[in-house]
Amino acid sequence: MTGASRGIGRGIARRLGKAGYDLTISAREGTRLQQAAEELSDITGGSVHPVAADMTAEKDVSRLVRAHDERHGRLDVLVLGAGVGFSAPLAQTSKRRYDLQFDVNVRAAFVLVQEALPLLRKTAAGRPEHGAKVIALASITGLFAEPDLAVYGATKAALISLCQSVNAEASDDGVSATAICPGYVDTDMTAWVRDRIEPRRMIRVDDIVEMALAVTKLSPCAVVPDITVTRPGRQLGRA
Ligand SMILES: NC(=O)c1ccc[n+]([C@@H]2O[C@H](COP(=O)([O-])OP(=O)(O)OC[C@H]3O[C@@H](n4cnc5c(N)ncnc54)[C@H](OP(=O)(O)O)[C@@H]3O)[C@@H](O)[C@H]2O)c1
């Protein structure tokens, strides 16, 4: 899984490890990734393999899939967790930030799915009662536009669409994909908004972890293309 060193990804990795999954975890920053791997293997007792990789570098993305395949030869759950977001009015968004968000949030996810699909199909064929899953951390901004998050929202809309394409092409073979679409979750990523939204009013990492875990338990007869998780009251449907 990508984006596993912090935040939501780390929470999902912890829970999957406790559920008995062997894990390949990835992020860019090696020291923090190594610490996450040590903490995860202490908690779970299972195999945890850290692979430092930058999702803007295609060779890193391919190396990540290869490293997992060589070690395990199967892939039950691919979690697309790595993501970046920058807030700016549409008119003032730089092309550099546009490219970075699309590279990490969409291109890397596409390449990961493309390269992992044969392994996911093989795993699903060998375990037809469970199948194999792709879980993408998308965003509510991919469903409803949010001021100042035009590019981020567009990347997450593309990720939701990528999950739908996986379902269209591979769910008959037991490989299904779910895009989880939350509003603001209390992590490092939302530090910039804490002055106007208190962390206690944000969705909890554990709320998203529960959704991800539920998806892993579904039979291949049930495809859940997306799950929207919104904050309550006046914030319904908003980030
Ligand atoms: N927090 C929210 O409110 C929220 C809401 C909706 C959706 N999401 C989505 O959920 C996912 C996780 O968000 P989070 O809040 O947990 O974020 P976070 O705490 O900022 O963690 C982001 C993770 O992605 C990794 N990452 C970032 N850029 C990367 C790159 N270029 N290559 C490889 N790894 C990279 C980070 O590790 P390194 O920095 O070491 O690379 C880290 O492990 C993201 O896709 C985000 O868009 C978050």
Q: Where are the predicted features?
A:
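Substrate-binding pocket helix/loop in short-chain dehydrogenase/reductase
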Residues: P89-L90, S94-D99
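Active-site helix of classical SDR
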Residues: V113, T155
